Amino acid sequence: MRFGVLAAIEVSSALVGIVVGIVSALYDAGYWALVLMHLSTALARTVGVWLGCRWRPGLPVRGVGVRSMLAFGGNLAGFSVVNYFARNLDNILIGRVWGARSLGFYSKAYNLLMLPLRQISAPMSAVAIPALSRLQDDGERFRDYYLKSLSIIVFFTAPLSLFCVVLADELILTILGSQWLDASGIFRLLAIGALAQPIGNTAGWLYVATGRTREMLKYGSIGVGLIVTSFFVGLPYGGDGVALCYSCVVLLWTWPCMHFAARSTLVDWKGILGAIGHPLLGALTAGVAVLVLRFLLRNTLAEWAVLLIGAVVMGAVYLLVVFYIFGRKKSYVSVLRSLRKTGSTSA
């Protein structure tokens, strides 16, 4: 759990990739500049991890539990392959049936939405999984740490998702320009599913931390099957149809997914709903306030101004509801402190 080293490796490898890409482009490498950028980033990351890790491979030794580790890793790799297939099939289908233009709108909307959500979920996952693994023999501490982490995830992602739903047009126009306006509908529909997606993603924490990757592959494959089905159901209606059906499946499957992941732990529905309830209600309240504001200002101010004012109102109303009406200010501050303390002590 040397997160400072990991952060330094990620930042430095990204910088190496950027420099290589720029230099390659200056020397007229064309599209190969992009290839070289990604390759150099991966190579720099590998070198950084190798230098930062004290362990070195040696000769194989019998009787050290390799078989169980291979089973754990094999199931985890299997889930990653299946999940990767599902995450990319929508692009393949839309491009094949509706062409490059529709694929461009869909892909741009999806990537724009996922960018901020990943910046929240990825660091939390990097901290939560090893911490939970250390706590798996202490059921109550495991449960408390997971629920606190889940609450923090939803605290940040719920208002962000609702903000994207309400001000999708303004976001697309301000960030991408009017030529991408057709992507706003897809962006809005995907953002609806993004309300539940970060919650469902934490199910993976429970599976991995408790060594139940076989169940992760089993139930994850069911979820992938539902997602793939949603793509085919929505495909006749273009990118909007795929986005709508995908979000519906995410909203519906998240709850069985959480049930299967939590049933071998002390995490229960009362705890889950308690962790996510106030942030979701606060985000919905703030979303309604921004929706009213958008209706009043849409035809009087530029899109960027509506976006800026909407962000201020969203944040103010959300914090007012969660911190003061629900009285959660002290609890969230203490949660952040305890997560940081648990993460450091479990190292």
Residue ranges and their predicted role:
Residues 259-269, 290-347:
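Membrane-proximal transmembrane or re-entrant/amphipathic helices at the cytosolic face
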Residues 75, 90-92, 102-121, 148-155, ...:
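Alpha-helical transmembrane segments of polytopic membrane transporters and translocases
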Residues 9-21, 34-51, 79, 83, ...:
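Short runs within selected transmembrane alpha-helices of multi-pass transporters and secretion channels
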Residues 4, 31, 47-92, 102, ...:
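Interhelical loop/hinge segments that connect adjacent transmembrane helices in multipass membrane
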